[in-house]
Amino acid sequence: MSIPKIIHQIWIGSKTPPTKLMDTWKNKHEKQGFEYIRWSEDEMKKRGFISQLQNKIDDMIEINGKADILRWELLYEYGGFFTDADSYCMEPITYLVEKYKAFAGYENEQVRNTGWCGNTDQYDDVLARTHPVIATGTMAFPPKHELPRLAIEWIKNNDINVDRTGKRAWRTVGPGLLTRLYHGQVWNDITILPSYLFLPIHVTGCAYNGREKIYANQEWGSTKQSYDSMNLVELPPHLKEPTDKVSILISSLNTKAIYIKDCLDSIKNQDGHIFFEIIWINDGSNEINTKILKQMLYEFENTTRFVKVIYSENEGNKGIGYTLNKGIEMCSNEIIIKMDSDDIMIPNRIQIQLDYMKRNPGIAICGGQIAMFRTVKEKVINVTHHPDISWEEYKQKRLHWFINHPTVCYRKSKVLEAGNYDKNLKHMAEDFELELRMLKTHGFIKNLPNVLLWYRVHPEQVTNGSKTKDKGGAHSQYWINIRNNMINKLIN
C-alpha cells in the first residue's frame, strides 16, 4: 500500500496558530493534488474523528505531547504525511511520497547520533547510547501501518505523565517512542532519511549547507517556546532561493552513465549560493542511453536544491553546432557555463567564473585551465596554461588552441552578437569557430589561471575522432586544414 497524498498538521488549544508557516504546506501541496488537513478540535468534530487515546491526551501535561499522541492516531487511521505546525515548507514532498513506502528522518546525525548522551544510562529509554534519535516532526505512512499501531498500543498501556514518570513527552510519545519502535524490529518498508531534508538547522545551531534537496525548515517552537512570534519568522538567507543565477549548457550523445554521474555530482558539489538552470540536450543517443540519461536527470533534479533541469531531445543526431546553437537560445540566464557531459568541475569553478564576470562586465567570454586525466582524476597527465589573448595578438599567432571550450563562461547576449554556434558544423570545429568569432567581435578572451575542470581523456570523445573516424581526431591534417581556413576567412 502506498502513502496517500494527504498532509496532516495539528493545532489544538486557544493560542494563535502559526498560519504563516502552516500555509506554506497547504499552498505548496494542494496544486500537487494533495489533500491538506489542519486538525483542530472543530475539524475533528466535523470529520467525526474520535480519539481512542483521549484519556491519555487529557493526562498529558505538555501541549506538544498531546499533538504527538494525536499524530500517531491520524497516521494510523488515514495514512499520509504528518508535519509539525512550526515547519516551513520549501519544496513539495511529491517525490518522497512516490518513492518510499513509509519514511521518517533523523533529528541530527551529528548532535543526536549514537552515544549523544555520553556513557550515562539516563536516556537508555530512548536508546541514546546505541542509536541515533529519529524525529517525529515529519513522518509518512500508509493507513493502518503496523508502526503507528504499535505506538498507539504502547501509549495506551504505559504511563506518559511527566509528573509521575519524570520523562518529558519527547521521550514517551515522541521521538523517543519512534526510535524505540523502529529499532525494536526489522522494518523493510520504512526508510529513515537524512535530517537535512526537514531539519537543516538543528536547535543547537548545527546547520546543513550542502546542495542536497531540503524540503522544510523547522523553527523548534516547543523547544524555544517561540510560538507567539512564529508568524513573524523568515527563512534564513542560505535557505532562500539565490539571487545569483546561471545556466549550465551540456550536450550528450551516448555518454556513459558513470561519466554522467561524475558530471552531475560535480555540479551538485559546487560552492556558493547560486541557482543553476541546467540545459541538457540529448543529440540522438540510442534508446537505452536515453532512458538512463532521463532517469539520472530526474533523480538529480529531485535530490538537488536550487536547480532546474530543462531536458531536450534532438530528432536524431544533429551535431554539436546545431545542438549548442539551440542550447544557447534555450538558456534563460545571461551568464552561461559550458560543460561537457564527461568532465568534472572543480568545486568552486562556477563561483570563480561568476565572480569574475560580475567584477568585469565588459568581458564577453572567459575560460580557465584544465587538468587532464584518463581514469582517476587525481592522476593528472597534463595541465594547460593558456594566457589571455586579444584579437590583435591572435592575428599574429594564429593559434589552434587558445581556450579550453569545456571551461567557457560566456554572456548569452555576447554569444548571440557574435552569431551563435554555426548549425552546419556537426563535429569537432564548432567550438573553435565560435571562439574565433567571439574573439574578433569582442576583441579579447580572458583565460583565468585557475584549473576549473578535470578533463577526461578517453577513446569515445569527439576530440579523439570517435565521431569522425574517416577524418581523424582534432590534430589530424584534415581538421588542421579546416581550422586554417576558418582563421584565414576571419582575418582576411
Where are these regions (language model features)?
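Short, well-formed alpha-helical segments that are part of the catalytic scaffolds
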Residues: 15-26, 255-269
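Conserved donor NDP-sugar-binding/catalytic core segment of glycosyltransferases
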Residues: 348-381
